[in-house]
């Protein structure tokens, strides 16, 4: 129930959008006796109404196209419409991340937006529009190429955005420290994701120094 506790606390603190960079594929209620942990999580998603979850788009030889690997159906049904974004990174041949694909279609021609783009769309309560070589969300105009890729305008090196440990946030949620959540998360975009340097999410960028 850790994710559920944090989502509820951050949402009640006034966060405008919460991005959950974690893909749960195995039902927890089949793994853990006792409480219905999937149900607890689904209730938190329904209560918050502002959570973006990730999926992954994987090549499928049978389909000869991309296949969406989505969160558990129970989670998807609890989400608001259009609140899943793909987490596939665009990685250059040297292993660095300098650009990002923002839109992808699967083999059934379903259109998906990158999680970061979905977060912006949710934050501004605006639809994503594409015209020629531009994507528009609210008043944000994003230049893209024909593959819907943008060059990333990095805000700065690691540490540019505040990071708080998952465990600390959970402890504060358990304590009911509403003041902390309002002071730190009100009207903010909040990303919940792995912080371990060995995570697959950690990739070198032009700011990287060995």
Regions found by a protein language model. Give the residues of each.
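Non-transmembrane functional regions of envelope-associated proteins
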Residues: 1-145, 182-210
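Substrate-access "cap/lid" subdomains that shape
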Residues: 131-176
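Short, mixed-charge amphipathic alpha-helical segments
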Residues: 175-183
């Amino acid at each position: 129930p850790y994710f559920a506790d944090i989502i509820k606390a951050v949402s009640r603190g006034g966060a405008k959008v919460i991005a959950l960079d974690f893909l749960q594929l195995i039902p927890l209620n089949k793994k853990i006796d006792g409480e219905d942990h999937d149900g607890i999580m689904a209730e938190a998603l329904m209560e918050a109404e502002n959570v973006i979850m990730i999926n992954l788009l994987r090549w499928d030889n049978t389909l000869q196209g991309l296949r969406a690997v989505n969160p558990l159906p129970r989670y998807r049904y609890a989400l608001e419409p259009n609140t899943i974004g793909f987490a596939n990174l665009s990685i250059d041949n040297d292993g660095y991340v300098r650009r990002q694909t923002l839109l992808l279609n699967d083999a059934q021609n379903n259109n998906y937006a990158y999680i970061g783009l979905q977060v912006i769309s949710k934050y501004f309560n605006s639809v994503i529009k594409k015209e020629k070589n531009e994507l528009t969300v609210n008043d944000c105009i994003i230049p893209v190429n024909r593959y819907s890729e943008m060059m990333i305008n990095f805000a700065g090196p690691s540490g540019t955005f505040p990071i708080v440990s998952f465990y600390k946030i959970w402890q504060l949620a358990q304590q009911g420290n509403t003041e902390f959540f309002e002071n730190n998360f009100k009207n903010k975009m909040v990303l919940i994701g792995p912080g371990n340097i060995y995570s697959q999410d950690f990739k070198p960028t032009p700011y990287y120094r060995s």
